[in-house]
């Protein structure tokens, strides 16, 4: 790649930016986000807590656990950006900036944001995660994986199922969850 783009700083910058976004999202999804959903508690406790506003939580919070979750999710992007800085420092920094802007944007549904239909069509074509998609992930942590790109969702779900099947402790969790739901349904509220 470097020999192709070495003659053009603009092409090098675009290449570095795209690598940071695509490879960073892949690494963050499969090396942090998916393992947290299978084995971890930090991400589930901080990012999927229904008692909290996820706009305040993801964007404004100063809670150390929330910040740690955010930093750990960003580490793959930072590593890729450091490697891409040799190709184009400006492109690597632009990739990080666009990634951070996307973090803020994808948490705006709670503020009343609705993505315009024309932009939905463009984003769907580019497989970009919309705020409405990410809102679905907050409401149901089993769907809509991929920080920036939707094409990581299906492989992430497949990997989660595989890892849960290989984890002996986790095999009983769906059974316990089903039993608990049946108990709740069987207990009728009294007025």
Where are these regions (language model features)?
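Primarily interfacial, aromatic-capped hydrophobic alpha-helices that serve as membrane anchors
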Residues: 164-191
